Amino acid sequence: MSTHMIDVSPATATGTSSGATMIGHGEEPQLARASAYFSALELFSIGIGPSSSHTVGPMRAARAFADHLAATGRLPDVTRVTCSLYGSLGATGLGHGTPDAILAGLTGLRPETCDPRDVRASWSGLAEGATLTLVGSHEIPISKSDVSFEPRTRLPGHPNALTLSAWAEKDGVPLFEETYYSIGGGFVRQSGDPIEVRPSAPQPMAYSSSKELLALCDTHGLDICDIARANDESIHGPEKLDAGLDAIWDAMHACVETGLHVEGTLPGGLGVKRRASGIRVQLEKLDRPPEPGHDNATEWLHAFAMAVNEENAAGGRVVTAPTNGAAGIVPAVGHYYLRFVPGANTAGIRRYLLTAVAIGSLVKANASISGAEAGCQAEVGTACAMASGALCAVLGGTPRQVENAAEIAMEYHLGLTCDPVGGLVQVPCIERNAIASSTAVSAALLALNGDGTHIVSFDTVIETMRQTGRDMMTKYKETSEGGLAVNVTVC
């Protein structure tokens, strides 16, 4: 499996919708967590839209399933592959392009390297008598009915679950079957895998809480980005890390630029028009000096975020940050830094990304970054905390000011539901990213105006978010069964 076969202690959803059925494989084993830190090259993952949990994760699961069939010599015997989508995947998978992603993964495509155009309509465009070539070498018949949607069936490992089954001719039982959980941010694990954080290598600056992270900064006289760099260099080495960070930023920048220059209507049937390009045209006409505090700084920030999320909604190339639904915030605030902060440079962007990862890792390790598990507070709230703390850092903030900025940003989003209209990552997702980008900047500036002393710690707000997600009703967690999803008329 890929490095994305990793999990953390999830928030257990207790508020289920009526009629839901729990099935599965018993309790997952819980192992001790050595460190909260996830590599920047894992938490930031180049992929495709519109969803890290419903598109990127399922594609990785399907590719892993097909690879296993090939590696075990079963591939020549396979005559059919079926897939069952459970819980949130079953509820909103159609709008998120999950079946398309699964078929693309079975053919051997990877979200990191595929052409997004090769994924679109893989399933939805199937004609009668269609065939599928498993990992490019074994052809089988395929039909839309081979993918089933079971939103009322919830497996205990995670709300986002799917089971892939390979069948041989005339056999009444699967030749091979595996259940996967798409746990947010493109991370996937198999049923039976231990719920744990598994660092790729021993980390010299391991920490499991913001309290421990700040203590490391105090002890060694380092900034948060230095702690992150030490851990990441122990995994990848300095050259690979810097090359990876630069590639991540290049992908973020390319996504912003594409989104700023494309017009039209987003797919899916809601009739949502792209707005980032129009905002860019208006701002360029204003021709104001690009300085912080000028009226157009906030407008540019909104345009940057919307550009990313419009590209994501169209199934384009995006970077999970830490998810696709919240992918616009970290790039938008990074572009704000480069455009409006004197002296901003590439080295600053690397510090920005590393600080963001150190913050996001804490949330992933101690709560969740999955909207299906804890609502939009886990996605947009986490991304806002990452961007706010990271901006505070590159503006000269101390580690305690950085932690304060992250806490303010996350605190603001507590209780935010995930209620996508029509099961699409468009309404309210695109505008939420724009406003959360503004919130990230405001929280960073507010923290910089203090000395880092505050009542609520980032650890406390993470735990509060976890508890809130646990208590949140399932209909508000990426099922499109509540909130705006049922109150907005879809024609």
List the predicted regions and their residue ranges:
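Conserved phosphate/anionic-ligand binding catalytic regions in large, soluble enzymes, centered on
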Residues: 44-62, 314-333, 376-385
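N-terminal signal-anchor module of multipass membrane proteins
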Residues: 33-48, 64-65
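Alpha-helical support elements that line or immediately flank enzyme active sites
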Residues: 53-70, 331-343, 388-396
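Extended hydrophobic packing segments that form well-structured cores
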Residues: 455-491
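C-terminal regulatory domains involved in ligand/effector binding and gene-expression control
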Residues: 111-289
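Accessory "access/gating" subregions that flank catalytic or transport cores
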Residues: 236-375, 483-491
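Hydrophobic alpha-helical bundle architecture
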Residues: 344, 355, 361-434, 446-455
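Glycine-rich nucleotide/cofactor/substrate-binding loop typically near the N-terminus or early
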Residues: 87-129
